[in-house]
Amino acid sequence: MQAEELQKLYKEQDQILATIFDSKYGSDQEYRLEREHDFTCEKQQRISAAKARWQAARLLVQHAHSQLGYAVQRWDYICRIPAVNSQMRYGIATEVRNYLIAASTNLRNSQGYLKGIDFPYCKTDEVSTLERATNNIYGDMATTERHQHAMNVFRSTFQRSHALLQWFDVVIDKTIDRDLLMAIEELFAKKRELRIERVRLIREKLVELFGAEEAAAAGLDEADLQLDEDGNLTDARRLQEQLSKVNEEELKKQLENVKIVQPEKVQQSKEQEAAVEAAAAAADGDSKSADADEKAPKVEAVPLKELAPPPSEDQLFGDIDSIKKQYEIDMEEFQRAQDVNRARVEQGLQEKLAARKSRKARKMAQQEQTEKLLEESASA
């Protein structure tokens, strides 16, 4: 609703301005400031949209990371179950397989949100390797050697998915959020400049129509053109809050549409589940309570200086320079149109001046002729 309400207010503002200035711009300065405002606004919207895509992709990576962690836990767990309990081992292998399929799919889908971005971790070929290992899972649980080989693939992907999450956080927090804040501040500055110019133009219009006293009575005297610092801060906070609400609403919609793949459940009776737990505890020589306290797999964070660099601005936000170039083209076309209009006005003035001189010359010639005739009549 926030975005719709904002668009409604902008539409009402445009209608009011069109009524006041007869569907024209009040000044060349207003046009220039409005184009600068539109460019800055589009830039801010692009960055906001990029943040929404990155957060949606991060959500998928986060789920994939959790699913990989659980799969590593259960795959490690399976080797502690006696070989005679084949039904239990196959049940856990199926569970691991389902979690790995879900993780692979979520990793691939996350890349779909960020087309043109090369992931430094969990690349496409790494996901393909994980999928091949997943397909061989029932054979890999047959021997210790093959089990360990599969574990190396699963654990490596799990660790690299953690590095990928780190990379996402750095890109979002250190790059996108920084650029978004700068864009919001720049947008506020342009909004303020445009507002001051429009207030000035409206005041001039009121003075033209009703006189200075009526304009002052309307609350648009010179003092209104000077916005104090407290007012600036209030407007800045209001704008930031307004944009934040719109961004949160867009992000919420985006995240609601993210299709997170969950692993297919493996149907097991309570007796089978209890038997699996008891068998694993017996293989370890530990109590059931000690096994229940088993923690998730540990993973070392990548030092920031070793983390992959963030993408370029063009990769993150698209070709923003093209928006700027379009703005410059629009300004050049507007300036040419204004020059043509001024030339036409000047030409019209010159033609009127020439016509006036011509009329004056004819009038003087007629007057001289009349005086000459009068003189001749007087002589006669």
What are these regions (language model features)?
Residues 57, 64, 69-79, 83-380:
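C-terminal modules of long, charged coiled-coil scaffolds in eukaryotic assembly complexes
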Residues 1-48, 66-88:
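Extended, amphipathic alpha-helical coiled-coil scaffold segments used for oligomerization/tethering
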